[in-house]
Structures are given as C-alpha cells and as structure tokens.
Amino acid sequence: MSSLRQIAFYGKGGIGKSTTSQNTLAALAEMGHRILIVGCDPKADSTRLILHAKAQDTILSLAAAAGSVEDLELEEVMKIGYRDIRCVESGGPEPGVGCAGRGVITSINFLEENGAYEDIDYVSYDVLGDVVCGGFAMPIRENKAQEIYIVMSGEMMAMYAANNISKGILKYANSGGVRLGGLVCNERQTDKELELAENLAKKLGTQLIYFVPRDNIVQHAELRRMTVIEYAPDSVQANHYRNLAERVHNNGGKGIIPTPITMDELEDMLMEHGIMKTVDESQVGKTAAELAALSA
C-alpha cells in the first residue's frame, strides 16, 4: 500500500476551488488512486460533482439528528461516488450562529477515530480560504494537510487571498510538516493572467502547478452535477484536469515554506505588468472618466 498523501485545496470563495479540486481528484481516481474527500466549506458543495447530488448530508447535521457525533456510524456520513471516491462533508451551523470551523474539527476527529483513512492513497480537504479563523485553518494547524494547493486567478482579490493563505502556511510550517505545493490558476481571462500567476508563484517561492483554461464545458458538466472527467472524458478540458492531476501526483515531497509578500509588493507586481499604470497617489479613487479628463 502506498503512503497516504494528505492534500488540501484552499482558495478565495467563488474562485472555482471545489470544481477544480473535484475534477483533479476524479482524474487521480481514474489513474487508479484511492481517494477520500473531506469537504470543509460551509456550502457543503465539495462532493456534489462526484456524487451527482445537490448537497451531501453533513456530519454536523447528522450528529444533530442523532443526538451527538458519538452516535454516528462511518457508513452514515460517508458516501461513495464516481470511481469509488469516498465523500464526507463536515458542514457547519446555521448562518449567524456559531463557528462554522467547528464542523471541520469535529469531522476530522470523527473520521480518524473511525478508520476512514485506512486503505486510502489521497485524502483531500476542500477548504474555504478567505476566512482565516482557526477552524478553517485546522487542517494546516493540526498538521493534517501536508500539501496545500491554492486555487487562484489573475484577479486582485484572488491573489490577495492566495498571499494570505501563504501567511497561514508560513505560521504553522515550522511547528508541523505543512508545505505549499503550488498555485493553480483557474483562468478568468483577465489581463496578463498567466504572467501574473507565474510572477506571484515566484514571489511566494513556489511554482505555478497548472494554468487551467476557461471553458464553458465546465459549466455544462456542473449543471449536470458531474465533473468534466466523467461528463466529457474525451474533451480538451478533461485532459487539462488530467495534466493537473499528474502534476499534483508527481509533486509529492516537493512543497516549500512560502515567502508571503506585502500589499505594497502585490500592487507593485500589478504595476510591473501594466495592470496598474502608475504609483501616482493622486489617481487613487478616481473614476475612468476622471482619469481620462486629466490626461486629455
């Protein structure tokens, strides 16, 4: 049996993290690897494309119905999906009441105690990355996830979130074994996106693992609650996800301790690539029309 690889996909909300991770994991399963997905996002959408389901019952919701987590059996919380991928969603409380990160902590403890990680090649944590509270940092803080892959794009806030996640990895890297595996750029077709992604990776001391091109077939597959790997296995996009999976598979043990940058350095990078045209503070807060009038 191969040694267990514990990876995590982090990223800004809405960046396509869950879609990217599920397609990557479907490709890994297609390669013959045994996969467990632990969804750590309150939306509980980390497994929907693998299970063809709107949302999986979460550990916290099932525990509430049963009385406590101790009253649950592993078979009740774990569902089997595409290519025998095992799926679990941690869940969280109602919006506005309590800490959603509590579900992450409760779930991982329950899974470990009940042998969920046995006979598995990969366990993948799909984590909301622009929330930096301790609960969501749990896979990093408790040395559960060894390799972190950050899904980002060429958008300012996606890069900002990637840098913030890198700060979290740096904080716990010395006390545990967590490392940054690399960045995955989920294309949004912004200006000079590939250049920016490669530059940010370089500044963080890591690599751009893969640049995933934008393709409407991803949305077509999602509407049918399927990964592209399953929905259109012969498509160009499916092969992109297979290439990404291959890169992740071959990246074991190659993670690094990141070197996060400051907000000023991030803005400087945008200026270097012509996204922000000048450092002139007088232009801050000016509309496009106002700037055009000034330059006329």
Curated annotation (Swiss-Prot):
Its EC number is 1.18.6.1. The reversible ADP-ribosylation of Arg-102 inactivates the nitrogenase reductase and regulates nitrogenase activity. It catalyses: N2 + 8 reduced [2Fe-2S]-[ferredoxin] + 16 ATP + 16 H2O = H2 + 8 oxidized [2Fe-2S]-[ferredoxin] + 2 NH4(+) + 16 ADP + 16 phosphate + 6 H(+). SUPFAM superfamilies: P-loop containing nucleoside triphosphate hydrolases. The modification ADP-ribosylarginine is found at residue 102. It comes from the Bacteria. Pfam families: Fer4_NifH (PF00142). Keywords: 4Fe-4S, ADP-ribosylation, ATP-binding, Iron, Iron-sulfur, Metal-binding, Nitrogen fixation, Nucleotide-binding, Oxidoreductase. GO terms for biological process: nitrogen fixation. Binds 1 [4Fe-4S] cluster per dimer. ATP binds at residues 11-18. Its cofactor is [4Fe-4S] cluster. [4Fe-4S] cluster binds at residues 99, 133. Belongs to the NifH/BchL/ChlL family. The key enzymatic reactions in nitrogen fixation are catalyzed by the nitrogenase complex, which has 2 components: the iron protein and the molybdenum-iron protein. Homodimer. This is Nitrogenase iron protein 2. The gene is nifH2.
